[in-house]
Amino acid sequence: MKRQLLLCLAIISFLSNSGIAQKAKIAAADKKYNSYAYIDAIQTYERLAEKGYQSVEMFEKLGNAYYFNSDFEKAAQSYEKLYQLQSELAPEYYYRYAQSLKATGKEKEAATILAKFENKSSDDSRSKRLKNNTDYLEDIKANVGIYTIENAGINSKYSDYGSTIVDNKLIFTSARDTGGVGQRKHAWTGEHFTNLYAAGVNGELIPSNPVRYDANVNSKFHEATPVFTKDGNTMYFTRNNYLDGKKGKDANKVTLLKIYKATLVNNRWTNVTELPFNSNNFSTAHPALSPDEQTLYF
């Protein structure tokens, strides 16, 4: 009898400790998620799921973490588990689930989920666009072949985007690792912070080997999406809220994005300043100039 009692107490103690450990792991993952460290959060959520833990909140966050990193296949899998646990979801989860399904080629399944999104959010502008253009996929297919898209030959396995041409150079954004001291990774994506790169282009606009762009512009945080005036002497670009060695944060201690301006002097970019409409409390990003250079869109 005494042995049985001890065994029962041992089992209760084990289950109690396991529950406490599980709650601690969930709390740690949630903390990572709430600070946008999605890659770390994903690893913990996945380990919990592998051990059989399931909750609506966890699969909401796991799906979002994949969705915000454009891993739509795994996002769809997570949202599917969420949908199995609770078929009545907030409209945004129907939308993200449908977009993830669509991105993985499951158009019929996506249409079913989108219908639920439309029913729950008839006033949403996305819902209205879907209702007004139900055959948008057919429109896209009808235009296939109008343009020829080729790999530029300078892409890496990381994010490469936000390109423009100035002075026979292709200037673009990349998260590639080209070495150097202090290489840092972004907790959101698990990739290196993006910098600007330059690749010479020939008469056929074929780029050559890219190199890191001007050190006065690139910092230890994100730089992206440059745009230049026609004379090539002024550049507008996106950067994390960081200038002169000082990092700005919003009320939640998050470093957002701002648009900066730089001036070319003696072939070096100088006078990096932020534009006056920036704020610590919201992001401004991805500038574009009108043809007459009188208006900056962002």
Please provide the spans of the model-predicted regions.
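Alpha-helical segment of the N-proximal tetratricopeptide repeat
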Residues: 22-47, 51-52
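Start-of-helix register in tetratricopeptide repeats
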Residues: 23, 57, 91-92
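Short, conserved micro-motifs composed of acidic
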Residues: 103, 107-109, 116-298
